[in-house]
């Protein structure tokens, strides 16, 4: 029983630390060729935010991407004038890699 209590306490401690520490995401204003060219950094997601990557493609060619903490992030795909925009969301530290 003591071993189980210790395991439970350790597990709860990790969950608490995750909440206190917050979700950390990569930020980049402009990524070209999967390399951050401007605004590289990190953000800590606030309530209702997730890590996000929005990538823009023309045909099969990646044009550029942005990376950020995004409020009420939704995965979506849209196309306008031949430019495809794809938004991906994730909830693990630094999951929005470039």
Swiss-Prot record:
Domain UPAR/Ly6: 23-98
InterPro entries associated with the record: LY6_UPA_recep-like, Snake_toxin-like_sf
Transmembrane segments: none
GO cellular component terms, A-Z: acrosomal vesicle; extracellular space
Keywords carried by this UniProt record: Cytoplasmic vesicle, Disulfide bond, Secreted, Signal
Disulfide pattern: 25-51, 28-36, 43-69, 73-89
Tissue note: Specifically expressed in prostate, testis and spinal cord. Present in the acrosomal region of sperm cells. Present in apical epithelial cells of prostatic duct.
GO term, biological process aspect, one: regulation of neurotransmitter receptor activity
Signal peptide start and end residues: 1-22
One function term, GO molecular function aspect: acetylcholine receptor regulator activity
Localisation per UniProt entry: Secreted; Cytoplasmic vesicle, Secretory vesicle, Acrosome
Purpose of the protein: May modulate the function of nicotinic acetylcholine receptors. May enhance sperm motility.
Family the entry assigns: Belongs to the PATE family.
Name this polypeptide is given: Prostate and testis expressed protein 4
Taxonomic source organism: Homo sapiens (Human)
Gene (name only): PATE4
């Amino acid at each position: 029983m003591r071993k189980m209590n210790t395991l439970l306490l350790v597990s709860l401690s990790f969950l608490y630390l995750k909440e206190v520490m917050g979700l950390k995401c990569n930020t980049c204003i402009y990524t070209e060729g999967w390399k951050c060219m401007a605004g590289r950094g990190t953000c800590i997601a606030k309530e209702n935010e997730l890590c996000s990557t929005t990538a823009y493609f023309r045909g099969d060619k990646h044009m550029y991407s942005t990376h950020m903490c995004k409020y009420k992030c939704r995965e979506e795909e849209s196309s306008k004038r031949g430019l495809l925009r794809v938004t991906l969301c994730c909830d693990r530290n630094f999951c929005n890699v470039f």
